[in-house]
């Protein structure tokens, strides 16, 4: 009995001690958000500047981008900050208006490629069989060629214009989404929550739309963000080769092509080329930041 009282007394004393004077709890180290990194801030600022330029291009551009009323090949000055081109057009105004072509079209083709590739990859990965074989063989066929070469062939067959250039870039871009999504679906379809839903009588389309879609959103969003820079580069490359935007459109790739005819007037090609470079870098920074924010393993590494 005394032993029992002694034991209970010790336990109660320990409980009272723990209640009155709790053990010091280990402080949780605050995590560093990926969106506060210098690269993320730089990317967001650049993208924000380009978006403002695209929305308010008519208000902030100093001149009409198509007006030919100044001396040709005028070097950068206080009157024309980026100089003039071979037709006497203000390059700054053309670069600003170029955001209205490059950025919306890049976003459009990435959305199209993402939707097509995600749907085909999810269907191929979940149902398998002949559907999987056909989709993956088509994807392998597209990926067997360099993207720019295949895009050039498609535009050459359909005719050189901006619409066909967008279509060509979509054709060369969707297989990447299809392969990534297929791999994710092959892994997720063996998960317990998917098997449970199937046992309850859910159809394959319901499983894809309800169970798997939320798990695919993060990786697909990261891939799309990274693909925006590639889309800008491919569209500009096709326009540089004369297969995309046609004169007198103020498109960055076409402007670089115009400047390649006269290396003495370096500003004609340098400023639109710098716009391409900055936009590609900004979208890559955005994609990397989004990946770090959505990937728990990367987030833990950042907090360390």
Task: Show which residues each predicted segment covers.
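Transmembrane alpha-helical segments of polytopic membrane transport and secretion proteins
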Residues: 1-48, 287-304
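Hydrophobic alpha-helical transmembrane segments of membrane transport/permease proteins
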Residues: 2, 7, 11, 15, ...
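Generic hydrophobic transmembrane alpha-helix motif, especially the helices
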Residues: 81, 85, 115-116, 125-191, ...
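Transmembrane alpha-helix signature in integral membrane proteins
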Residues: 91-126, 279
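Transmembrane alpha-helices
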Residues: 100-116, 145, 151, 205-237, ...
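Glycine-rich helix-loop "coupling/hinge" segments at transmembrane-helix boundaries
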Residues: 143, 154-157, 169, 183-185, ...
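C-terminal transmembrane helix and the adjacent membrane-cytosol boundary/short C-terminal tail
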Residues: 169-172, 218, 222-228, 267-304
């Amino acid at each position: 009995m005394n032993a029992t009282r002694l034991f209970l007394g010790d336990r109660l004393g320990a409980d009272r001690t723990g209640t009155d004077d709790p053990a010091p709890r280990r402080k949780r180290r605050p995590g560093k958000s990926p969106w506060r990194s210098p690269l993320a801030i730089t990317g967001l600022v650049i993208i924000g500047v380009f978006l403002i330029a695209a929305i308010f291009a008519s208000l902030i551009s100093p001149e009409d981008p198509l007006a030919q009323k100044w001396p040709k090949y005028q070097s950068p000055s206080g009157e024309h900050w980026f100089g003039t081109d071979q037709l006497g057009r203000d390059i700054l105004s053309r670069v600003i208006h170029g955001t209205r072509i490059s950025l919306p079209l890049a976003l459009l083709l990435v959305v199209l490629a993402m939707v097509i590739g995600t749907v085909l990859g999810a269907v191929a990965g979940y149902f398998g069989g002949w559907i999987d074989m056909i989709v993956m063989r088509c994807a392998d066929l597209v990926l067997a060629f360099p993207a720019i070469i295949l895009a050039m062939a498609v535009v050459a067959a359909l005719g050189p214009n901006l619409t066909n250039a967008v279509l060509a870039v979509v054709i060369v871009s969707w297989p990447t989404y299809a392969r990534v999504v297929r791999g994710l679906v092959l892994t997720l379809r063996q998960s317990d929550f998917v098997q449970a839903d199937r046992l309850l009588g859910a159809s394959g389309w319901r499983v894809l739309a309800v169970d798997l879609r939320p798990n695919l959103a993060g990786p697909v969003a990261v891939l799309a963000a990274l693909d925006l820079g590639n889309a800008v580069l491919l569209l500009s490359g096709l326009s540089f080769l004369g297969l995309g935007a046609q004169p007198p459109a103020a498109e960055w790739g076409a402007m670089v092509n115009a400047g390649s005819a006269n290396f003495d007037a370096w500003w004609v090609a340098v400023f639109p080329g710098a716009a391409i470079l900055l936009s590609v870098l900004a979208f890559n920074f955005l994609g990397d930041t989004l990946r770090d924010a959505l990937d728990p393993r990367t987030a833990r590494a950042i907090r360390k």
